[in-house]
């Protein structure tokens, strides 16, 4: 991954964390690495544990940020969330996977939250 892509991703994750806090989320952990993959943000929304994938784009020629989530990435997100829940003994909590789309193609960043993005809780 190029330096510029890493910096774009890091900026997107920082913007997303602040955005989520403003939406009432409590940020528990960022950049959580597990054998199954990385979880960008682990947060709590009310009683629900949220595993948040952040997608950031500077240019939209190839689609919106949320459209870049592949089936393989979805499978990794599910496996990572399950692993996190087991590791921290949180299986009793309701959970979901959310996406935050960060569009940096305009002078002002545009963020969008998609709760329960995979349609399962």
Swiss-Prot record:
It comes from the Bacteria. Gene3D superfamilies: 3.40.1350.10. GO terms for molecular function: nucleic acid binding. It holds the Pfam family UPF0102. Belongs to the UPF0102 family. NCBIfam families: PRK12497.1-3, PRK14688.1, YraN family protein. This is UPF0102 protein DET0781. It comes from Dehalococcoides mccartyi (strain ATCC BAA-2266 / KCTC 15142 / 195).
């Amino acid at each position: 991954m190029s330096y510029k892509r890493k910096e774009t991703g890091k900026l997107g994750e920082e913007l997303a964390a602040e955005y989520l806090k403003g939406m009432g989320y409590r940020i528990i952990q960022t950049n959580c690495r597990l054998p199954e993959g990385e979880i960008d943000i682990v947060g709590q929304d009310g009683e629900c544990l949220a595993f948040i994938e952040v997608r950031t784009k500077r240019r939209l020629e190839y689609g919106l940020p949320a459209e870049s989530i592949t089936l393989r990435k979805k499978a990794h997100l599910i496996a990572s969330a399950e692993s996190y829940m087991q590791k921290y003994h949180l299986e009793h909590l309701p959970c979901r996977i959310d996406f935050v789309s960060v569009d940096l193609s305009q002078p002002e960043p545009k963020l969008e939250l998609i709760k329960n993005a995979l349609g399962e809780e």
